[in-house]
């Protein structure tokens, strides 16, 4: 199986491709980044990210794509750019009918290092060991993308089997609204004729 990992970002979008199969060592195919200038319009930057990812999809022909899930950060502008670049990667994969795995940073760290609290240096070190590389891939965004690809290589097939085994949830439709019934008014007491006792 060949997986393209995408560490989304507007300034640097990390990309990493690995090959692997159950019981064999994963192999590096390619790693790098797509860069966009910080001063450019967001639309132009997203187009550059899309063009870069598209070129990688054409060149490396992955079987699946793994994208980092956006998590909450204090810097809203950073979160927005990351989310937008991630959405571009997901859309490009969907256009090619490629399965997409979404993983949080802690899921990726746990898959690669055994600890969801690992730092970037530990992730880079383990990616280097797992892929049998001579040095840590640079920049860190490329190493993170490779970690995403490795995470999907190991977890993706199991998650797909779980989804396939789970019974399909019935589609619930809202019940049609029924008009509220009014309870009948109690009848007014009969009036007695004047002078009746």
UniProtKB/Swiss-Prot annotation:
Cofactors named for this entry: Mg(2+)
Active site (catalytic residues): 7, 68, 141
Enzyme's top EC category: hydrolase
Keywords: Cytoplasm, DNA damage, DNA recombination, DNA repair, DNA-binding, Endonuclease, Hydrolase, Magnesium, Metal-binding, Nuclease
PROSITE patterns given in the database record: RUVC
Family under the similarity heading: Belongs to the RuvC family.
Protein name: Crossover junction endodeoxyribonuclease RuvC
Organism: Frankia alni (strain DSM 45986 / CECT 9034 / ACN14a)
């Amino acid at each position: 199986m060949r997986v393209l990992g995408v560490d989304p970002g507007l300034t640097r979008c990390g990309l990493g491709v690995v090959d692997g199969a159950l019981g064999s060592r994963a192999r590096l195919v390619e790693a790098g980044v797509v860069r966009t200038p910080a001063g450019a319009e967001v639309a132009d930057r997203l187009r550059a990210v899309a063009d870069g990812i598209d070129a990688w999809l054409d060149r490396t022909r992955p079987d699946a794509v793994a994208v980092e899930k956006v998590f909450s950060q204090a810097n809203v502008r950073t979160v927005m750019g990351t989310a937008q670049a991630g959405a571009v990667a997901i859309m490009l994969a969907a256009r090619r009918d490629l399965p997409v795995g979404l993983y949080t940073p802690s899921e990726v760290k746990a898959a690669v290092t055994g600890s969801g609290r690992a730092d970037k240096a530990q992730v880079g070190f383990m990616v280097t060991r797992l892929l049998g590389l001579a040095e840590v891939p640079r920049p860190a965004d490329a190493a993170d993308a490779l970690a995403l690809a490795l995470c999907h290589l190991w977890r993706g097939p199991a998650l797909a089997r779980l989804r396939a085994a789970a019974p399909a949830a019935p589609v619930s439709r809202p019940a049609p609204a029924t008009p509220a019934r009014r309870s009948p008014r109690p009848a007014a007491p009969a009036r007695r004729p004047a002078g009746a006792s």
